[in-house]
Amino acid sequence: MNIISWNVNGIRAVEKKGFLNWLSDCGADVVCIQETKANPAQLSENLISPPYGENASAALSDSSGGAGLFDDCKRYFSAFSSAKKAGYSGTAIYSKVRPDSVENLGDARFDDEGRVTIAKFGKIAVISAYFPNSQEAGARLDYKLEFNKAILKKCDELVSEGFNVVLGGDYNVAHTPIDLANPATNEKNPGYLPEEREWFTSFLNAGYVDTFRKFNSEPKQYTWWSYRFHAREKNIGWRIDYWCVHKKFEDKVVSSTIMADVTGSDHCPIQIQIEE
């Protein structure tokens, strides 16, 4: 199973930057999206049911948005978790095969912000997660740590039920100094606070694996860059997007990579391949 995760920083905005063409061509079986900043009622037909494969380009060039035309066009199934607050947060999962079931975290504190979408395919549970930003001066640090606790609990429950949990998304934390360009000057900044990093360590100690580091120990491997100061051009970034699995299923991971050449957001996609 080929799975991609991407914080698109607004799905309607990235649609205007070629997102649907990218999605059609990316070859993924499942695509996890974070920071949709929209609810399904605000989206085009092609964002609700994105075409792929033969006839996809024709459907995407159709001025009506693809509604009702090209019925033989293959389309992704979609599941959205939207925030109650308009234009904020939100997650989604696209899949070529309809999931057996779709659910949220089951905690209104976080479901009201659309933080998690879970899709089950047999005994694989794919999770698209948008971890909270702790914000300046740690204004939402307590909220984030409560979210972290809740998602770990959910993952543990799924693992205990025999699911291979594949947790992807924007974790909003750079775990170690190798995971950001300027660690020394960011020690008091959101995304690199000691409490956030300590939680990630405890998450790994609880039996989960940062799959990218399973294959790649090199520095300067980032997934997010500020829009300011030509940061991406200079590769002054942070690695805050991850694919994690439980160590029980670590041997199922074939590869875990960063798709740094894909643009359209301040994040780039990340990809994992797992044996089914």
Language-model segments: residues:
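Active-site-proximal beta-strand elements of phosphoester/diester hydrolases
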Residues: 1-9, 123-135, 168
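Active-site beta-strand/loop signature of hydrolases that rely on acidic residues for catalysis
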Residues: 7, 23-41, 126, 155-177, ...
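Short, acidic/polar
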Residues: 12-24
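Metal-dependent phosphoesterases centered on the DNase I-like endonuclease/exonuclease/phosphatase
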Residues: 30, 51-52, 58, 68-69, ...
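Structured beta-strand-rich core segments of catalytic domains in phosphoester-bond hydrolases
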Residues: 37, 44-134
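Conserved beta strand-loop-helix elements of the APE1-like EEP
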Residues: 86-102, 219, 231-251
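Active-site beta-strand termini and strand-to-loop segments that position acidic
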Residues: 96, 119-122, 246-247, 272-276
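Surface-exposed cleft-lining segments at the edges of enzyme active sites
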Residues: 107, 131-148, 185-188
